[in-house]
Structures are given as C-alpha cells and as structure tokens.
Amino acid sequence: MQRFNSEVQALTTRPADADHFSVVPIEAADAISAARRIAEIAARRLYGDTGEVGFLSPQAAPGWYRAAIGEQRRSDDGIMLKGVTISIHVWPTD
C-alpha cells in the first residue's frame, strides 16, 4: 500500500457546484485506486449520502483522472446520473 496526496476540482459553470479541495493522504494499492476513493469522497461531499461515482477515467498526464459524480435518478430510459465532472490529481507522498 502507498499513500497518495490529491487535489480535486469540479469542472462546472454553475457557481453552486463549484468546488476545489485537497484530501488528506489516502492509502491505496495504486494511483487509480486512490483516485476512485477520492472520487467517492467528493461525491459524498457534494451530494451527501446519495452521492455516487458514475465513471473514472485516466487522462493523458500520469496521476490525472476525470470522474463523473452525482445522484442517480430515474429517467424514461432507466437510470441517469445527474451531477458534475471532476478533475483529480494524485501523487505519492514519498
């Protein structure tokens, strides 16, 4: 297990959804596992207990990830995720 620092930024044009924060070091097996845990924290921070992570994908630069977070809602086509996209940067503490 490694420890990872992180920064998170919500990518939104709505001021009510704007958020930028750092998370205390997270223990995880690798960077993408740390990013997944951080996305879960961000979802709960913005949406409370109903917050979910829709997807997590690596970006071109190492240590950078993008995730869709929000609340699952019923729709005509089934279930949709209403939320925001966040940018996550993780790096090892050591």
PLM segments and residue spans:
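A short, exposed loop/beta-hairpin motif centered on an aromatic-Gly-Thr core
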Residues: 17-33
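A short, charged, amphipathic alpha-helix used as a generic interaction element across diverse proteins
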Residues: 29-51
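Beta-strand elements of well-folded, non-transmembrane domains
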Residues: 10-14, 27-30, 71
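Short, mixed-charge low-complexity intrinsically disordered segments
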Residues: 44-94
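Short aromatic-glycine-(Arg/Gly/Cys) micro-motifs in beta-strand/loop hairpins
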Residues: 1-22
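Hydrophobic beta-strand residues in large extracellular and virion-surface proteins
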Residues: 4-6, 26, 34-35, 39, ...
